[in-house]
Amino acid sequence: MPSIDVYNVEGKKVSSVDLKEEIFGIEPNEAVVHSVLVNFLANQRQGTQSTKTRAEVRGGGRKPWRQKGTGRARQGSIRAPQWIKGGIALGPKPRSYKYTVNKKERRLAIKSLLSSKVLENELTVVDAFNFDSIKTKQMVNALTNLKVEGKTLIVLADKNENVQKSARNIKNVKTLQVNTINVYDLLKYKNLVITEDTVKKLEEVYA
């Protein structure tokens, strides 16, 4: 069972916490992570692209010239695909790119990435963010004290407006709650900062 130090927002070690092996200590499964990431990105696509076929563009109702005798190639409509302003042949139409992946796969992908953060020393556990007001500076100071630099994902156990709004104007810092944690953000952000309550909730949800 992996153990990790717990710090306060001043950057001082206050305790340590044991992490459940089945969530924070498994062998990362890259194939499953990739599969779930592709699914996540596909589900973000709007799929609103659209083109008009020759039946939908305006004009072209009559034959532009007679079939024979002009010396020109035969044409049936000035809105056929080969014409300028003609309809598009086999063009994209609105569609949904959404599909589902197995719930076990999604859970395994999250656990793989949490374990990866532990293995690569990219996980920081804080006792709590007890902010009594919304101030960007206090979050900047907390991250500086914790020696967390670069892209950082802060995952909270529950909604905390003071913490979330204190972090939202800091470049390369994002906050999520346990119920919205996802593969994309765990991969995008190098550092993962969580509270002791978050550890408990993750172990409760993913056990």
Which role fits each region the language model picked out?
Residues 30-68:
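A short, flexible low-complexity segment enriched in Lys/Arg and Gly/Pro that occurs
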Residues 54-90:
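Glycine/serine-rich anion-binding loops at beta->alpha junctions
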